[in-house]
Amino acid sequence: MSNLTPSNVSTNMLTATVSRLPLPAVWTAGSAQQRTLIMGVALAILSNLLFGVLYAYSSFLAPLSGTQVFIWRMLAMWAALIGYLLISGRLGLHLDKLKALRTVKQWAWLLLPTPIFLSQFWLFMWAPVNGQGVQTAMGYFLFPLMMVVFGCVLFGEKLSRLQWLAVGFAAVGVGSEIVRTQSVSWATLWVCGTYPVYYILRRLQGIGAITGLLVDLTIFAPFAVAYLLFVAPSSLGLVGSSSFFIMMLAGLGMLSVLAMKTNVDASQMLPVNVYGMMSYIEPALLFILAITVLGNPFESAMIYSYGLIWLGIA
């Protein structure tokens, strides 16, 4: 009996396609395992770069508010994901997984992480235009380390001395920031405190990332439409009368799906520890964009706090 899954099929097809491209010798030399590793690293870098672009994207969609951009992004992402699955012929594979859920308890368990997902995507679009860019980036810096802690506590994973040292540096950095500001940003806490819960729940459910994403977006789509009709009808007129906004929102949806797709493929190709380390590229980009592009304030006293966090990451 074949042990191929939809994700394995997708990964194998991608690897086979890449192998036919005229790539540099370093990409094609070595064993198949080495080539897969190189391709996984490339996809991880691409996905993190795309997420960095998406973080600054909302600043180019003024006068839409951060919440309105979030609503439009969810709808554009849903449409782009459905289009991708239809064109690739994989929609049926994901629907078959959902058809296997036959009880209310199974569906309730499946939908439990959805509010966390939606709140995280809202914060991702709201923070850059509301002065919370640096604080949100700090949450993403802490997210991988929080995953290590959750893995240790919930799954009995063992930490090496270096990993404990990294967690310690990050903890001191966060503590320093709390002392400096005499508070801690709710955006930082929300990212590092709830996003790991989302991934842990999806892991326990054993559902693929694309299937989970399809469920999350489909459930939210009617609420997004209702919001535009009854709460923010002005944004409908603004978007509908502007080819610029239509193209920008279409690009937002396609970039979002591409970012998620490359991220999922990278997670299938890379060892867990390598994939985890690659995930630090995104918060570094978010932090830089928050300061340079979005104009969020950065005080010299923050160097100590963030320096300790970066030291833990290194």
Model-predicted regions and their roles:
Residues 61, 69, 73, 127-128, ...:
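Hydrophobic/aromatic residues within transmembrane alpha-helices
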Residues 2, 6, 12-71, 168, ...:
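Glycine-/small-residue-enriched transmembrane alpha-helix faces in small-molecule transporters
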Residues 2-46, 79-111, 161, 213, ...:
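Membrane-interface interhelical linkers
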Residues 137-142, 209-219, 257-292:
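Helix-helix packing/entry segments at the starts of transmembrane helices
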Residues 56-66, 95-98, 129-132, 174-175, ...:
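Membrane-interface helix termini and inter-helical loops of multi-pass transporters
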Residues 142-162, 284-303:
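C-terminal transmembrane-helix exit sites in multi-pass transporters
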Residues 45-53, 57, 111-128, 190-201, ...:
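Hydrophobic alpha-helical transmembrane segments of multi-pass membrane transport proteins
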Residues 14, 21-27, 74, 280-314:
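C-terminal-most transmembrane helix of multi-pass membrane proteins
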